[in-house]
Amino acid sequence: MSRLSLLGLTAAVVLLSSFCQDRIHVDAAAACKGCAPPCVCPGTKGERGNPGFGGEPGHPGAPGQDGPEGAPGAPGMFGAEGDFGDMGSKGARGDRGLPGSPGHPGLQGLDGLPGLKGEEGIPGCNGTDGFPGMPGLAGPPGQSGQNGNPGRPGLSGPPGEGGVNSQGRKGVKGESGRSGVPGLPGNSGYPGLKGAKGDPGPYGLPGFPGVSGLKGRMGVRTSGVKGEKGLPGPPGPPGQPGSYPWASKPIEMEVLQGPVGPAGVKGEKGRDGPVGPPGMLGLDGPPGYPGLKGQKGDLGDAGQRGKRGKDGVPGNYGEKGSQGEQGLGGTPGYPGTKGGAGEPGYPGRPGFEGDCGPEGPLGEGTGEAGPHGAQGFDGVQGGKGLPGHDGLPGPVGPRGPVGAPGAPGQPGIDGMPGYTEKGDRGEDGYPGFAGEPGLPGEPGDCGYPGEDGLPGYDIQGPPGLDGQSGRDGFPGIPGDIGDPGYSGEKGFPGTGVNKVGPPGMTGLPGEPGMPGRIGVDGYPGPPGNNGERGEDCGYCPDGVPGNAGDPGFPGMNGYPGPPGPNGDHGDCGMPGAPGKPGSAGSDGLSGSPGLPGIPGYPGMKGEAGEIVGPMENPAGIPGLKGDHGLPGLPGRPGSDGLPGYPGGPGQNGFPGLQGEPGLAGIDGKRGRQGSLGIPGLQGPPGDSFPGQPGTPGYKGERGADGLPGLPGAQGPRGIPAPLRIVNQVAGQPGVDGMPGLPGDRGADGLPGLPGPVGPDGYPGTPGERGMDGLPGFPGLHGEPGMRGQQGEVGFNGIDGDCGEPGLDGYPGAPGAPGAPGETGFGFPGQVGYPGPNGDAGAAGLPGPDGYPGRDGLPGTPGYPGEAGMNGQDGAPGQPGSRGESGLVGIDGKKGRDGTPGTRGQDGGPGYSGEAGAPGQNGMDGYPGAPGDQGYPGSPGQDGYPGPSGIPGEDGLVGFPGLRGEHGDNGLPGLEGECGEEGSRGLDGVPGYPGEHGTDGLPGLPGADGQPGFVGEAGEPGTPGYRGQPGEPGNLAYPGQPGDVGYPGPDGPPGLPGQDGLPGLNGERGDNGDSYPGNPGLSGQPGDAGYDGLDGVPGPPGYPGITGMPGLKGESGLPGLPGRQGNDGIPGQPGLEGECGEDGFPGSPGQPGYPGQQGREGEKGYPGIPGENGLPGLRGQDGQPGLKGENGLDGQPGYPGSAGQLGTPGDVGYPGAPGENGDNGNQGRDGQPGLRGESGQPGQPGLPGRDGQPGPVGPPGDDGYPGAPGQDIYGPPGQAGQDGYPGLDGLPGAPGLNGEPGSPGQYGMPGLPGGPGESGLPGYPGERGLPGLDGKRGHDGLPGAPGVPGVEGVPGLEGDCGEDGYPGAPGAPGSNGYPGERGLPGVPGQQGRSGDNGYPGAPGQPGIKGPRGDDGFPGRDGLDGLPGRPGREGLPGPMAMAVRNPPGQPGENGYPGEKGYPGLPGDNGLSGPPGKAGYPGAPGTDGYPGPPGLSGMPGHGGDQGFQGAAGRTGNPGLPGTPGYPGSPGGWAPSRGFTFAKHSQTTAVPQCPPGASQLWEGYSLLYVQGNGRASGQDLGQPGSCLSKFNTMPFMFCNMNSVCHVSSRNDYSFWLSTDEPMTPMMNPVTGTAIRPYISRCAVCEVPTQIIAVHSQDTSVPQCPQGWSGMWTGYSFVMHTAAGAEGTGQSLQSPGSCLEEFRAVPFIECHGRGTCNYYATNHGFWLSIVDQDKQFRKPMSQTLKAGGLKDRVSRCQVCLKNR
């Protein structure tokens, strides 16, 4: 060991000497000037010594502070696939969510188009003035208003009388008076007579925005700002299956179409595997079977015009053609000459209803009560009503059972065992405020189960005798108007009479219109006359200074000032608030068991106990407080205590050896901002080099859509398109247009979600140098850095103290040998103060090196020397070891936003943090702005109660006292302990009800009692006043963010912040380790509390004996309605009813009065918690209450917002004939017909009788085109004589509309048939151009009430009230029922016009008004279908035919717009002949002229458009009967497909004669994104060949599709399989028994469903045969009140089996179940004699449901 030490010492000497050799003299002198002689050690460098042995390890250091949270580790490897977990138990019902935040106000709608000018209305008659309204109640004195505008000067009044103290003289003209308070709104006047016809007004301003349109398509899903917590929804469907170990979030799969694999055996649904790699392209398959014959192709393009064919034999006269379509409108003709006076016109249409006249006189008379209306549908749930006034206290209920023992308190600190003498009883202190609730105590030992109680007796008395009949009540108020009934069947057309009826009664006043736009300010009125002279004023002293004004609104924030100079270093601040508790340390070592306690003294003998048992003794007087007992005997040794707290940090150990440089650590999270450090010295300005610009980051995710911009102005009307209509086939979508001009900048949108974190950009330009921060903790020693550049020689620093010799350094490079110096010696003297700088002496000769002297004592540091000259560059040294970390700089200014980074991976769920320490109470806030004038306040609270007197002895039960006045509120009593159950006292006589007392002070929170019995319903409380609506706040736009200022000093503690929005639910953390604690020692019983205040009076006595009923008096005259009486005496309690169903949770009740202090009971053992009882039976319905008297008339309400569009009204009477419509467009060219063979001209036969119309023949196939004819120009032939017109054939019956069939195969060309008889009218032509917009129709009925509006913007904050006593924490109440409507409040002063609020809830639908006048005729609608042929007309007159040469058809001009008709002008002078005008409109047919000469045939013109139908020709001679045609065969079957559903798990069989196409599962409808899309159960689309709970996916605009990752639904026809016993959802293969099977069948003819609306199966129509019978299924709804329906003509509306809900609901997570929101709708039976009567409501129970369901049959048309 000594050798080793010597070796180490030698190495140290060698190293030290070598170290000293490398130092230059100048450095040595500079480093330790004044410490010791310079170290001069000549000699050669020794060899490197062996490394020394490591020293002993130092003491372990104190535990450091908690380090910053480490960065998340790299994601681990995927774990092995876990097994399916067991199905979890049903979760507890979630808490009621917070109400959602109000949505953003919608944008203002576009202005409507200006309406057309209305026709002049009939002038109304003047109405009579209404009666003056009743004088209103006197309002409270209002606040002084602002000075009004100067009024008009009044007329000069007579001179006033002289004042008291003056002879009086004319005063100066007084200032204008202030504007008076606006009067109350008067009652609406009666409607006035219609005024005279007014001049046509100018075009009106654009109308108000129209009614909101239907909901548009769903917009892009953007993440909006998180709303407030919503109300709890209905119980949700079961949760999703557990996540796999590696599934940190749902994987959004992009759907790629993979190759179809071979069909395997259908197994259970597997788990979703990861997407596999794309497969290889498969080989070409074998050629398929030849496909079915394709559908008939579209018509080809028209071929070239063929040559003219030979003239055929004249055919038979055709049938009279139908009227052709109207031609295009001609160009306007020249104005005609003024016509003569016309004949009197028909009576004009009634004009629009005139404005309402003034109110007529009140009519008298009492109508009889109308019939009771049908029960209306449930209204939309209203918003939460204002809280009503507290009701009168109900009768005291029976005493509840003893409550459960309260939670044990927190154990106190163990005190030293003391011994005190009992002192005198102190005076009662004031009751203290309620303290903060203590932390929950440790659980006590389990008690023993108590003994069973005595069984109770259920006694039910006999029912009472029937009372005598009451007097007849007053006639009831007419009931509400019932909902509009269903539309009846269309009645028979009435017979109109061409008369104008007498004018109708003046209609009721209409609903107030929408508020008009704010008008333009009017011109100032003329100055008024001088006012009357004011009275002289006597001695007018100065006014008393007014009260201090309300504090003003806080001003706007000023602009940030320039940064101020650096402040001085502040004083040390007050110690900060205690920090949040640190994270839990690791478990400490188990503490040693405690020492046994000191043995207690034996206790005194207790007093005799109370007799326990069913004795009827009254409770005794409580005894005096006993003395403290002596300490008890020592208890048993306690069990091991809880683990001790971790020990404090130990003292710092000695520093250990420097370790190896560690690996580079993971970047820690950004630390908290450090406090401001001491400002450092001003550093030199750093160099700045501009960095290279960074590469642009990745594009962030799409932000939230901004609010839509304001609508742009309406563009000018476009040029009308040319009216050349080629085949009306929709063209291909056009090319996208050029981007529009940029709109104005919209308001800032809501902030988008943060984009993914982008990659690090290139370094930016260095910012300005920040201030130095506080010194940071020393960092770890880093690895040696790269060799730095050679720095300039700095100034000499202040001489420091000589340090201890450092560790041995590495040997340096050998320095240049110095000149030998003189040998010096001497004893080191004490260090003197440094002297002044002497003059520079001449340089001495260098002396030889001296021996090294011993180190001198460290001297005191000298003053800093002056700056020396720059030395020469030294030789580069070895790279030094890495220095310690520098001080942390002060945070620089906020840098510019970096490019958004890519989104990081979701972190794992964090550990649950411990509850934080409760925050300190915030300071009182500044007083808010003064509120508006409120309604008169309710009476203030009474003062504090006086001290309670000494309780007197119980007196005898007195007679009922007179009605007491308001009692004072008592102070809250201390919480007494539970006393024993007292005996039931005698019932007192019920007292008169007292007036409504004011609310008492809140009491201390009582212990939770056992739930009491359901008390009888109390009488309704008086309705509360309605609060004034607050003014909405202005919508402010966010300002630009200011520059980050310097950090300011810590401000005073801020006001307590409002509760933040609830955070998102965190993911469930892992189960923590739990160690059961050992039970603590039993504490000593506490002292008895102070006596409580007097309790409330005892329960009411038994009800008195009912008196004998009086004789029935005669009915008196009905009196005037009295004012609302006081609340009556509570009635006698009825017989105890059976338990009712659970009601909704009531609102939290007022705290009860404190009870009398009971005697201290013995501490019982805690009982075992009982099991949940069974729900009670439903109680009997109570008797309906008496109808209340009518309330006072309320003030007129604010105009309601426009309701939604109502349902379409009843079919109106047929309108007057409309004006002739514009001419329609020309029809398209027809296809050329087949060429017939030449027939022989027949002899004219006798006219035959009209034959019956024959059956419609099948359409012939297209023939081949004929050979082109040659053009032959022959001489014109002689004009033949005109033949007689033929008779018209009878019209054929209209054919039924057939369903479109599949295209048939091409047939062979048929034989040319003989001329067939007239066919039925053809199919309607293609749809024409859309007609002009019709005129505005009548307003529809008011719509159903809309969805409740969003909550309004909160009003301004009122003045702060005085601090109240701390209330007891109430239980969270559920939403109460809306209170009854309160009495009308006193009319308030007219407030300022508020900003437009959010749209309120739609009002109730108004009473249906009388039928309005006929509106203007609408614009021409679309051309209707051709009507049935009219009756045969008489043969027309014989016309002379004239053949004019056909002219060239002109091009169609653009139809001009219809101008207003001008007034006829006077005849002007004849002008010179003008140019040839445009061809005029065709005039009326002139008399036939003489036959002209036959002209040369003209060239064949192009085929013209189809001309208008010609006039009816003369009847021709009857032709010869043609040969009978051969009977046609059956047309080929087009095939009709339908689906048939079995409603079982068996695949249904197609009916006889039908062939099955495929089989599958019965899909009813799907619901995605909250919208339902249904299937017709009679169509093949409702039979999917494969089943899945989520058979569809949704795709977005980013070409990404998602499968089973949303809350969507699918609904399937179900079987009769019942629900599971636990009613939990089914999953996997357990779903199969619930899903109905189906088959798709094909039949050759049409198939329909007929419904009887009766319990009997209907018969198929003649020519149809039945296929199956069933029940008429109409509609279905489910989640979100969404659903679809069945067409009643479809076979899907006739289900073979009836079930109330014939379908099951399935979700995307693979579960199916029946839910309470699923409803089925079935046609009900309608009796023949009750078709137009009010339907009787009826509720059917199970077993009799089919008695009211309509039956149906599916029928097939016979061939």
From Swiss-Prot:
Domain of life: Eukaryota
Gene Ontology molecular function, alphabetical: extracellular matrix structural constituent; extracellular matrix structural constituent conferring tensile strength
Outcome reported for the amino acid change (mutating G409E): In allele g23/hc70; temperature-sensitive lethality during late embryogenesis
Cross-link (S-Lysyl-methionine sulfilimine (Lys-Met) (interchain with M-1623)), chain numbering: K1741
Keyword annotations from UniProtKB, A to Z: Basement membrane, Collagen, Disulfide bond, Extracellular matrix, Hydroxylation, Repeat, Secreted, Signal
Assembly information from the UniProt record: Trimers of two alpha 1(IV) and one alpha 2(IV) chain. Type IV collagen forms a mesh-like network linked through intermolecular interactions between 7S domains and between NC1 domains.
GO cellular component labels: basement membrane; collagen trimer; extracellular space
Bias (Low complexity): 104-116, 140-153, 278-293, 399-411, 574-595, 833-848, 1037-1047, 1219-1232, 1247-1271, 1281-1309, 1341-1357, 1423-1437, 1472-1482
Lineage, highest ranks first: Eukaryota, Metazoa, Ecdysozoa, Nematoda, Chromadorea
Source organism of the structure: Caenorhabditis elegans
Residues cleaved off as propeptide: 21-194
Region described as Disordered: spans on this chain: 51-245, 269-415, 548-596, 618-650, 666-720, 787-1522
Underlying gene: emb-9
Protein name: Collagen alpha-1(IV) chain
Annotated knockout phenotype: At 20 degrees Celsius, there is reduced axon regeneration following injury in D-type motor neurons in temperature-sensitive mutant embryos.
Family, similarity comment: Belongs to the type IV collagen family.
Compositional bias annotation for Basic and acidic residues: 1410-1422
UniProt signal peptide: 1-20
Location relative to the cell: Secreted, Extracellular space, Extracellular matrix, Basement membrane
Disulfide bonds: C1550-C1641, C1583-C1638, C1595-C1601, C1660-C1755, C1694-C1752, C1706-C1712
